[in-house]
Each structure stands twice: as structure tokens, then as C-alpha cells.
């Protein structure tokens, strides 16, 4: 490793557990982990140029909420089988809303916007007629039961976040279902555009849950509590607390989400 980089990282006002991970990734060949290296180098450069703690907070988040954190199984399966699962992704046609007697209580969009958990029971994971490749037979890696379980857990995690704006890193959390708009004549928009909507929606949901708002494991939460308790200065402690200000936890055994104890320090 470049000794200059090693000196810089070793002098950062960060806990050794964080610095060791940064050094480990930066010491690998440049061709290895290119994305991870970029996401480490950019906030590091930001801190060196501007000072302040924002770059350090990004480093802490990237190390402990991404590099060191194993995603839950349902997100790993969504990532691996996204092209298959997007063929079963729930949607709502705008023209179908005209037939509803009570849009507020029956529309998927309105229920999601209002954070109503009952919408999870109304979601259907059936093969829709978009994203088809002519008459080519489709082969699936997952069974219907597996698909339903993965998608239910994905949307349960999304609902947990939707109900808690304090955990958002964005001003507005979009709804996770695909909305199929209408043409001026009242028909569905062209199929090619709908295909794009399904692809974009599954990518954005995966990115939001996997990268932008990852759920800690109970073990990862304990590690962060220990690190914060060991911080030698109040300034370092604040860096970690701010990086954890939107933390929440998934107990994989019970499949329950909860707001992290890390937020209680703030």
C-alpha cells in the first residue's frame, strides 16, 4: 500500500475498527472492488479538501452499513433474481382507479402513501403480461411460494420505512408499486414504456433498501454500540452517532424490524 495513504487513514479521527477496514480495501489491487474503493476514496478526499465531519460520516456509513453488513436474504434474492421477480411485481393501472368506489381505502397508491399496513395483504404477486420476449418459454429459478415470500418481505421492510419518515435520507419516499399511467385517450401507456417502469422500479427499490437504507443485524448494532462507547473524544462519538441517525434493525429469525438503539443516543 502507498505509505502516504496509510499515514492519512491512520490519522483520521475514526475508531480503529473503521480505519482497519478502509486500509484493507485500499490495500487491494485497484482492479479489485472498484465500486467500494470509489465510495471510500470520494468521502476521504472530501474530508481532506474541505475538513468538517460530513466526509467522515459517509466513510463510517459506507464501512459499517455496507461493506461490513450482510444484507438480509430477501434482498440478496431480489438482487440475484431481479429480472424474474420484476415479472411478478405488483402494479396499479390509473384507469382502474375510475372503477373504485373509495379510492382512499382501495387504491394501492393511496394506501402506500398513507403508510397503511393493510396494503401488504392486498398486494398480488401474479405474472403480469408485460416484460415478455415473444413466444419464448419462461424459466424461473424460484417457485411461486419463494417469490411470494421474497416479495412480501421486501415490501414489509419498505412499509417499515414508509411509516417512519425520521429514518429517511430523502424528503419523500416513493411508493414501491408500479403505476401504469394513461394516454390522453384513456388507454394504458405503450407496453415498452410499462416495461421500463417495472425495470426502473425494481432497481430503485433494491437500491433504496440495499444501499441507501440498509437494515442492521442485531450483531452489527452491538458492534456499533461498542465502537461508540469506545470513542475517546466527543467529536469522534458525534461522527458515529450522526452516521447512525437513521439506523434500524432486522431480527432475521423473527422477521421483525425495529428502530435501532443507536438512535437513542441522539
From Swiss-Prot:
Its main location: mitochondrion. InterPro entries: Gep5. Pfam families: GEP5 (PF17053). GO terms for cellular component: mitochondrion. One of its GO terms (biological process) is mitochondrial genome maintenance. Belongs to the GEP5 family. This is Genetic interactor of prohibitin 5, mitochondrial. It comes from Eremothecium gossypii (strain ATCC 10895 / CBS 109.51 / FGSC 9923 / NRRL Y-1056) (Yeast).
Amino acid at each position: 500500500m502507498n505509505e502516504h495513504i496509510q499515514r492519512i487513514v491512520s490519522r483520521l479521527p475514526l475508531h480503529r475498527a473503521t480505519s482497519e477496514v478502509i486500509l484493507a480495501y485500499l490495500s487491494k489491487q485497484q482492479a479489485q472492488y472498484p465500486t467500494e474503493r470509489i465510495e471510500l476514496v470520494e468521502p476521504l478526499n472530501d474530508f481532506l479538501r474541505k475538513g468538517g465531519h460530513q466526509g467522515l460520516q459517509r466513510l463510517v456509513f459506507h464501512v459499517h452499513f455496507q461493506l461490513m453488513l450482510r444484507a438480509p436474504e430477501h434482498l440478496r434474492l431480489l438482487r440475484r433474481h431481479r429480472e424474474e421477480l420484476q415479472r411478478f411485481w405488483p402494479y396499479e393501472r390509473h384507469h382502474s382507479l375510475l372503477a373504485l368506489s373509495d379510492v382512499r381505502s382501495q387504491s394501492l397508491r393511496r394506501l402506500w402513501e398513507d403508510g397503511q399496513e393493510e396494503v401488504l395483504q392486498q398486494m398480488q404477486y401474479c405474472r403480469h403480461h408485460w416484460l415478455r420476449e415473444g413466444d419464448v418459454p419462461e424459466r424461473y429459478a424460484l417457485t411461486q411460494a419463494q417469490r411470494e415470500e421474497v416479495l412480501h418481505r421486501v415490501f414489509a421492510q419498505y412499509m417499515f420505512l414508509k411509516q417512519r419518515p425520521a429514518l429517511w435520507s430523502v424528503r419523500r419516499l416513493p411508493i414501491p408499486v408500479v403505476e401504469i399511467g394513461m394516454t390522453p385517450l384513456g388507454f394504458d401507456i405503450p407496453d415498452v414504456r410499462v416495461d421500463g417502469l417495472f425495470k426502473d422500479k425494481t432497481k430503485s427499490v433494491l437500491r433504496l433498501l440495499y444501499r441507501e437504507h440498509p437494515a442492521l443485524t442485531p450483531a452489527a448494532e452491538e458492534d456499533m454500540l461498542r465502537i461508540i462507547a469506545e470513542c475517546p473524544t466527543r467529536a469522534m462519538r458525534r461522527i458515529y452517532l450522526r452516521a447512525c441517525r437513521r439506523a434500524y434493525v432486522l431480527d432475521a429469525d423473527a422477521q421483525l424490524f425495529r428502530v435501532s438503539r443507536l438512535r437513542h443516543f441522539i
